[in-house]
Design a protein with these regions (language model features):
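An acidic/polar, Gly/Ser/Thr-rich interaction patch typically located in mid-to-C-terminal regions
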Residues: 31-62, 210-338
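Acidic/histidine-rich, surface-exposed loop or edge segments in extracytoplasmic proteins
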Residues: 113-119
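Short beta-strand-centered interaction patches in the first periplasmic/extracellular domains
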Residues: 2, 102-105, 109-113, 147-215
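Short, compositionally biased
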Residues: 81-96, 194-197, 311-322
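Conserved "cap/hinge" positions at secondary-structure junctions
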Residues: 71-73, 192, 302
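Assembly/oligomerization scaffold segments
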Residues: 1-112
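Amphipathic, non-transmembrane alpha-helical segments in extracytoplasmic/periplasmic proteins
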Residues: 45-47, 107, 121-146, 161-184, ...
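Extended boundary segments
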Residues: 1-27, 151-155, 233-261
Length: 338
């Protein structure tokens, strides 16, 4: 092993037709792993050389194929400094180019043959909690579920799942109460984005860290909303309540009918925070750093008014045989929460 910074990749491809696992390490030309903080499952695209045409004969993809992909980084002393990826994906499509003898495999973190993400359902949930809804839903698919301690777990008197897939319903109800939801390595996790925003920055990013010409920013100068309004009943009395965290301008969002004052405040805060969350966005490319993952925070320095603490929404990890390992970072400046 050379005593220089370098990257090593491992791609273990399990073929459902042959019931065997093959190493594609020596064939890999490019790997792109997309790491999303919330909403979407992680994905991978792997381009492999196929001069011996094994990918279209011996290794020809089957409907239940899986791939485990890992990018390992090593420092000047030859010691491992970090790992990116290291999760299993379900292959859901491939493309082939005969002229260059290349195949690109696309993998997704969400089980592809499951009705979890594909089949709309209608169901009424009563007298339950977010945690129970998530647990029972995931249990139906044999999908491991974990709720982090900081995530809200409200009591829910009644909620309708109306012609929605279980995946979209869980995501929307999690978001309704200010939580984030992520699927990776066949696990579903509900967590508090606010708690992750409070964590210490993993590093400081300056001009010298960023690939020339890759930095861009979009900043909205006016908040979408500065407060909320909701309605609820106490006995025969109908209440309309509102709350602002910035007095001027008064721009409120209507939450509608809620179960209680507590329910209205939880939903109101979550909706205002979500609407204002992406007011200030940056994107840029850096040399790969295993600490820069979705949900991590970093400090931006040397950009004047853009400086501050940022939360990573999305990381596109890219390895090529010619250029090594790079990352495209999409991040939002952390805003004052209601």
């Amino acid at each position: 092993m050379s005593n220089t910074r370098h990257t090593e990749i491992s791609v273990a491809y399990t073929n459902s037709r042959t019931k065997k696992t093959y190493s594609l390490d020596d064939r890999v030309e490019e790997i792109t792993i997309t790491d999303n903080a919330v909403g979407e499952g992680d994905t991978v695209d792997i381009t492999v050389m196929d001069k011996d045409r094994k990918m279209v004969y011996d290794y020809y993809p089957g409907v239940d194929d899986m791939v485990k992909c890992t990018v390992s980084l090593y420092g000047m002393d030859g010691g491992k400094t970090g790992v990116v990826g290291n999760q299993t994906f379900h292959i859901d499509q491939f493309s082939y180019n005969d002229f260059a003898s290349k195949m690109t495999l696309r993998g997704i973190a969400v089980p592809k043959n499951s009705t979890f993400a594909k089949t709309p359902k209608t169901k009424t949930w009563k007298n339950t909690t977010l945690n129970n809804i998530a647990w029972f839903t995931c249990h139906d698919y044999g999908l491991p579920y974990y709720r982090e301690s900081g995530a809200f777990n409200p009591h829910i008197e009644k909620v309708e799942q109306s012609n929605a897939t279980d995946l979209s319903f869980l995501f929307n109800i999690s978001q309704t109460y200010g939580n984030g939801m992520k699927i990776f390595s066949d696990r579903l996790v509900i967590f508090s984005e606010e708690e992750y925003e409070k964590k210490a920055a993993v590093r400081t990013i300056t001009h010298s860290d960023i690939t020339d010409g890759s930095f861009s920013a979009r900043f909205d100068l006016i908040r979408q909303y500065t407060g909320y309004e909701y309605e609820h009943d106490v006995g025969d009395v109908h209440w309309t309540r509102s709350h602002y965290f910035i007095t001027k301008p008064e721009i409120k969002i209507s939450i509608g009918q809620c179960e209680s004052q507590t329910d209205g405040e939880l939903k109101g805060r979550a909706k205002v925070n979500l609407a204002n969350r992406d007011m200030q966005m940056v994107t840029f490319e850096i040399i790969g750093d295993p600490k820069m993952i979705s949900t991590a925070t970093f400090n931006l320095s040397g950009y004047g008014g853009l400086d501050g603490k940022y939360y990573i929404n999305k990381v596109t990890n890219k390895f090529t045989a010619s250029n090594g390992f790079t990352q495209e970072i999409e991040a939002r400046k952390i805003q004052q929460r209601l």
